[in-house]
Amino acid sequence: LAQLLRRWHECVCGHQHGVCIMSIIQGTSKSSAATFEIDQSIRFNDGDTPSLSRTIGTPTSTQKFSFSTWIKPCTFFNDTASRAIFSAATPGNSSSDRDIISWENDVLYVAFNTGSWAEIKTSQVFRDPASWYHIVVAMDTTQSTASNRTKIYVNGSQVTDFSAAAYVSQNDTIAICTSGKLQAIGAYAYDITSANDRIDGYLAEINFIDGQQ
């Protein structure tokens, strides 16, 4: 987690090739600014049903991970679709053993199903069409305090205000870190061929760290 937050700080305050990266990011969202390219970035147009996926190999841990990305959604204002950012599952298994990080009704939604759903929704809404958001989801099911098992950060600050907050049981195994499961970016892994629930927006600097919260 410290590595991902440090990376966020570097992206906001640091320089690459003598240029402030945050200025580059902001430049892409302003119509009056020059056009820039952001390294390690991709545009997901939901109409094209895009996604990236891979099958998980041998994990470092089946109980701990950290995921981070910059995201600039292009669909806002009570969009009722569930927009998949990152997920894992056995393809075709829609009932259990699947994990989701998504954008839904302008809030961040994080859910894990280890037999029953443990769902977290932010109270804060994200509706600025000119903004990039940096998201970190850090997981450690071995923590004795339930709220420490799933931590969410937006733009470097931990989110603690939720409209829904249910946590996985202690020591649960999670699909995102399980060998043989499918990980997907931009779509739900359990239904990877479906045209539904695709992310519509930009993602950049996507990082997944296995075995660390």
Over which residues does each language-model region extend?
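Short, Lys/Arg-enriched N-terminal segments with co-localized hydrophobic residues
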Residues: L1-I21
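Low-complexity, glycine/proline/serine-rich flexible segments
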Residues: G18-Q63, N105-A118, S179-I185
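Extracellular glycan-recognition modules
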Residues: D48-A111, Q143-A146, Q212
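Short, aromatic/His-centered strand-loop micro-motif at the edge of beta-sheets
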Residues: A111-H134, T193
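Short, solvent-exposed beta-strand-to-loop segments that form ligand-recognition rims
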Residues: V154-K181
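Extracellular glycan-interaction patches encoded by glycine-rich segments
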Residues: I176-L203
